[in-house]
Amino acid sequence: MSDEEQTAIVCDNGSGMVKSGFSGDDAPRHVFPSIVGRPKNEQAMMGSANKKLFVGDEAQAKRGVLALKYPIEHGIVTNWDDMEKVWHHTFYNELRVNPESHNVLLTEAPMNPKQNREKMTQIMFETFGVPAMYVGIQAVLSLYSSGRTTGIVLDAGDGVTHTVPIYEGYSLPHAIRRVDMAGRDLTEYLMKILMHTGMTFTTSAEKEIVRNIKEQLCYVALDFDEEMTNSAKSVSEEPFELPDGNVMQVGNQRFRCPEALFKPALIGLDEAPGFHEMTFQSINKCDIDVRRDLYGNIVLSGGTTMFKNLPERLAKEISNLPPSSIKPKVVAPPERKYSVWIGGSILSSLTTFQSMWITKSEYDESGPSIVHSKCF
């Protein structure tokens, strides 16, 4: 047996992207959208060997004739049949392995409903026949990948944003903040504010175009009011080429869109805290003795933290909150888009971790609820 046949599989199932690969690697082997596409019109797809279902990149490539669905919304699996299809695609088509020969480490957002991880556990053992599995909390894995054991992780992906304070390797659950606002909400907000330019994006395929605009052109304003004033004085626009070859100009929407991360009321979440307030509230729920260490190690994780100027703006907003003597340090690792996966790769390759796996025999004895006692 080759080493790879023995190696654990690490699969970070995000609301927007699946990151998968092997334990011990320094980056995921495969990254693809967490989407399942079905033909809008059965007749139109005759050429594709009558396939009824497309997953990931293939669904993305054929999006013009497909209805696209994301099986994970706000970090919670809402369609288990489709989720199974995504896992099947991950194992057999992307990684090209038989899951019956590999332990599997999966990831999950904190404060998810208990049945979500129970069902994940059940499917891994009963449908895919894995020998052992584990579910890691996304933010904790991110901190491992940054080489720290103490810090507060702000993890913002496509479906969920959460702040998790961790001290000496232990997460402090009472202080976790979670808001169901992340990248997908920004994409929808951008669709809305681009309508004023006369462009309408309505279908699931057009939403993917707007996501590309967001990822390529949007940035965080260091000072929003100043940026608005400047953009009113001089028209500053960036071109974006649409799939049909037309070019649209994108103006102040480029910084108005990510502003919602600091002012969630812009997208109708009047009660939700912004990134800076979430971080601040989480730290203040921790013991006074550990707060300084947490302020000094605010670690960003996830694709929605990749906007230009976001780390600087976050530090500025937090330092404006009391007590003013605190000087926050925001750490923005360049690989933070994949830091959850990297943390899973590190954790699952440690010799000390090997006793942490939930084995098939433990599952047979205790059932899916074993996941709560063995995975924190």
From Swiss-Prot:
**Major subcellular location class:** cytoplasm
The UniProt catalytic activity note for this protein reads: ATP + H2O = ADP + phosphate + H(+)
Listed GO MF terms: ATP binding; hydrolase activity
Is Hydrolase one of the keywords?
A: yes
Keywords for this protein: ATP-binding, Cytoplasm, Cytoskeleton, Hydrolase, Nucleotide-binding
Task: Extract one GO cellular component term from the record.
Answer: cytoskeleton
Q: Which EC number(s) does the record attach to this protein?
A: 3.6.4.-
Say yes or no: keyword Nucleotide-binding present.
Answer: yes
Q: What class of enzyme is it?
A: hydrolase
Record InterPro entries: Actin, Actin/actin-like_CS, Actin_CS, ATPase_NBD
PROSITE patterns listed in its UniProt record:
ACTINS_1 (PS00406), ACTINS_2 (PS00432), ACTINS_ACT_LIKE (PS01132)
* Location in or out of the cell: Cytoplasm, Cytoskeleton
Lineage top rank: taxon: Eukaryota
What role does it play? Actins are highly conserved proteins that are involved in various types of cell motility and are ubiquitously expressed in all eukaryotic cells.
Q: Which family does it belong to?
A: Belongs to the actin family.
Q: What is this protein called?
A: Actin A
Q: Which organism is it from?
A: Trypanosoma brucei brucei
